[in-house]
């Protein structure tokens, strides 16, 4: 078997979306599984829609996820350049060869003329191009030229055959050539279209397998016809193998749109999804390691991935499942690695100060690693550490529930016990020993009653890292200041929020 060569060739429009990244991932995984090559090129021939910002965003998304490539943008390779906008001379040369070989022909008909011919023949005027110009005489061509018309160039399809191919995802495919009109490969100004340059680049770069989205399935017969024309003029060697990946759907099983917030890859990154979690989840959009194994590493993906195992059915993007898988990958991280990633994330996205003590942060990170689904969750759990004592606001619902009249006694007792602990001994174990002895054993309070009020008083909310560790992180002074402030607000009398 010859070396597998796959490609990822997005257009730089908009923000990277999960469907696009899933395509990149499957190409990457297939290349790595087979020991082949991944080529990364940019299809930027649409000057009105393409932007450098989007171009850079695509590169950033691949680098964030750790999806590397063997040839292409920034890496170089034997088929440079890898941006279509820089390959126009190549396309023009091949277009001239196609013209000379009679594989393409000039078409002068306007859309209105095509519709009129359909109407005159009793056909649906919206049927599309009718191949009229394919058989123009020299005189007719000369007359159109005399009118000042500039032709588009269309590829001659074989309408007397069936276009067949074996799709690695969908099986045997068969399309009647009669249903495929001759299609435009170059505009009247000579500019080549996607219909020409995409397959042409694949041919010139030796692409053996085209793994792409299901939305491009209808174009496959036309591309096969173009490949065959390129083979006849000596530009291509073979028609590649195709595999069309299933749609990614959203709510209601409709195709996930670029406008859907959950389709935006960077929304997930900014919320604190880590690359391992995102890649694991995207792999499941059409593929699985086994029926009962959803969590796996990229090494396992590379070892087991085969494009033939991808299912053709639409794959629904389930945000909750993505977060659950991400939580598993967060827990799988080495503590030091997790701590560094969390710190970088909180400083970049949540405004955490760079000078927050490293030892305290490491302690805090260890407390939340098993309690969060995305890195952003840690900010909600740990924000109380950054809040000045006098600025701490109690979450009303939690305070009403936990700071009732009955909370005064455990708050007073806790303050008394904690005051007796020396500053240098204000650590988790002595704190827990003192409070559990007084509140649980001597006062015979249930832990929920005893500690609920303390938690709300020092953290401002009912959900936090473990209570005694949180007190150690705050330190003796801040802990006591907050407990006294909580006692002053007990029973909590904040007004009910308006519905």
Curated annotation (Swiss-Prot):
EC number per UniProt: 6.1.1.17
Organism domain of life: Bacteria
Motif ('HIGH' region): 10-20
Keywords: Aminoacyl-tRNA synthetase, ATP-binding, Cytoplasm, Ligase, Nucleotide-binding, Protein biosynthesis
Residue stretches in coiled coil: none
Chain sites annotated for binding ATP: 258
Subunit text: Monomer.
Protein name: Glutamate--tRNA ligase
Classification of source organism: Bacteria, Bacillati, Actinomycetota, Actinomycetes, Mycobacteriales
């Amino acid at each position: 078997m010859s070396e597998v060569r796959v490609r990822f060739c997005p257009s730089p429009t908009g923000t990277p979306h999960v469907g696009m990244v899933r395509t990149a991932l499957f190409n990457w995984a297939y290349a790595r599984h087979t020991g082949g090559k991944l080529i990364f090129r940019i299809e930027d021939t649409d000057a009105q829609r393409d932007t450098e910002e989007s171009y850079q965003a695509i590169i950033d998304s691949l680098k964030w996820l750790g999806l590397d490539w063997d040839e292409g943008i920034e890496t170089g390779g034997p088929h440079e350049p890898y941006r279509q906008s820089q390959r126009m001379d190549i396309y023009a040369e091949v277009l001239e060869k196609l013209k000379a070989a009679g594989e393409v022909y000039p078409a002068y008909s306007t859309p209105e003329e095509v519709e009129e011919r359909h109407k005159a023949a009793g056909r649906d005027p919206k049927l599309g191009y009718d191949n009229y110009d394919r058989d123009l005489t020299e005189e007719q061509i000369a007359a159109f030229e005399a009118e000042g018309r500039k032709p588009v160039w269309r590829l001659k399809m074989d309408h007397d055959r069936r276009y067949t191919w074996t799709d690695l995802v969908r099986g045997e495919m068969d399309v009647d050539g009669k249903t495929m009109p001759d299609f435009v490969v170059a505009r009247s100004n000579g500019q080549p279209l996607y219909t020409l340059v995409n397959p042409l680049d694949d041919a010139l770069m030796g692409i053996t397998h085209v793994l792409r989205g299901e939305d491009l399935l209808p174009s496959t017969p036309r591309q096969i016809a173009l490949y065959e024309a390129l083979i006849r003029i000596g530009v291509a060697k073979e028609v590649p193998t195709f595999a069309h990946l299933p749609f990614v759907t959203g709510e209601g099983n409709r195709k996930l749109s670029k406008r859907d917030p959950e389709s935006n890859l960077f929304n997930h990154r900014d919320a604190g999804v880590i690359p391992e979690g995102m890649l694991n989840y995207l792999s499941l959009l059409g593929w699985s390691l086994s029926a009962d194994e959803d969590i796996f590493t990229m090494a396992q993906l590379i070892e087991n991935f085969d494009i033939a195992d991808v299912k053709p059915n639409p794959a629904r993007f389930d945000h909750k499942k993505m977060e659950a898988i991400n939580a598993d990958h967060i827990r799988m991280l080495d503590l030091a690695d997790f701590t560094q990633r969390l710190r970088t994330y909180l400083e970049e996205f949540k405004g955490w100060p760079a000078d927050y003590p490293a030892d305290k942060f490491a302690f805090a990170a260890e407390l939340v690693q098993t309690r969060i689904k995305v890195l952003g969750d840690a900010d909600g759990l740990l924000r109380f550490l950054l809040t000045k004592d006098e600025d701490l606001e109690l979450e009303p619902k939690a305070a009403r529930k936990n700071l009732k009249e009955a909370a005064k006694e455990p708050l007073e007792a806790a303050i008394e016990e904690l005051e007796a602990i020396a500053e240098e001994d204000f650590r988790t174990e002595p704190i827990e020993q003192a409070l559990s002895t007084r509140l649980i054993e001597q006062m015979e309070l249930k832990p929920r009653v005893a500690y609920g009020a303390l938690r709300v008083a020092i953290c401002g909310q009912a959900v936090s890292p473990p209570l005694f560790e949180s007190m150690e992180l705050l330190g003796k002074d801040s802990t006591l200041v907050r407990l006294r402030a909580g006692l002053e607000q007990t029973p909590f009398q904040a007004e009910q929020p308006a519905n």
